Design a protein with these regions (language model features):
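ABC ATPase NBD coupling module
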Residues: 70-85, 106, 111, 115
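Conserved ABC ATPase signature
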Residues: 134-138, 142
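Catalytic Walker B motif of ABC-type/P-loop ATPase nucleotide-binding domains
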Residues: 159-163
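Short helical segment in ABC ATPase nucleotide-binding domains corresponding to the A-loop/adjacent helical element
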Residues: 97-105, 115, 119
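A short, proline-enriched helix->beta-strand linker immediately N-terminal to the Walker B motif
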Residues: 153-157
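Helix-to-loop junction immediately C-terminal to a conserved catalytic motif
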Residues: 54
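Conserved ABC ATPase "signature" region
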Residues: 112-130, 181-188
Length: 227
């Protein structure tokens, strides 16, 4: 389980996180996927918090724990977390298959096995036959699914989502939110954890209510419980 202990982050004179202590909540009924939403205005520090949890950015003080173990000395690639970026961050020089296979290759999986796993993961979210396509030829919704599959194909312990719908138009956001958790269940087979845990950063309360079992708001460096 994820836990934050007295986590503080300063950017110059700005205090983004003020000795935040927090534990992953108990979710009564999750249907295999637990979603905790983190709300807050732009610039509040939500994305910074995700990057600290992922190990991509250092806190000023405090620590991140998983299963009661401090992650202070655990490198990014060994944390077992996956981060899906706001703008999807697909590699334009790689086709869809090799984008999805990238994380597996970083883990030492052979090229052939990684590509086979990538193709199977693409099938799970309705993108069969897309492997050889250029990512630049995909629609926004297709790019989002490729980014999701790339995050999940490594079977992470925790999925970190940074505004996953903000790059899409309003009509498409509504359509894809409804199917998003189903895509997560299909692409994330639960080999590493019996329950799939998702930390969702969003500025959209309607999105948080549709997807989140629990939610907090990041305000003035503190996490305030909402539901």
């Amino acid at each position: 389980m994820l836990e934050l202990k007295a986590l503080t982050k300063r950017h110059g004179n700005a205090l983004l996180l003020d000795a935040v202590s927090w534990q992953w909540p108990t979710v009564a009924q999750s249907d295999g996927v637990e979603v905790v939403a983190l709300l807050g205005p732009s610039g509040a520090g939500k994305s910074t918090l995700l990057r600290i949890i992922a190990g991509l950015e250092a806190a000023t003080s405090g620590e991140v724990l998983w299963a009661n173990r401090s992650l202070a000395t655990v490198p990014v690639e060994r944390r077992g977390f996956a981060l899906m970026f706001q703008q999807f961050a697909l590699f334009p020089h790689l086709n869809v298959r090799d984008n999805v296979a990238f994380g597996l290759r970083e883990q030492g999986v052979s090229k052939a096995a990684a590509r086979n796993d990538a193709d199977a993961a693409l099938v799970s979210v309705g993108l069969a036959g897309y492997g050889a396509r250029a990512t630049t030829a995909l629609s926004g919704g297709e790019q989002q699914r490729v980014a999701l599959v790339r995050a999940l194909v490594t079977q992470p312990k925790l999925l970190l989502l940074d505004e996953p719908f903000s790059a899409l138009d309003a009509a498409l956001r509504g359509q894809l939110r409804a199917a998003f958790l189903d895509d997560i269940r299909r692409a994330w087979d639960g080999r590493t954890e019996s329950v799939r845990r998702v930390l969702l950063v969003t500025h959209d309360e309607a999105e948080a209510r549709q997807m989140g079992h629990h939610a907090w708001r990041l305000e003035k460096g503190a996490l305030v419980p909402l539901w």
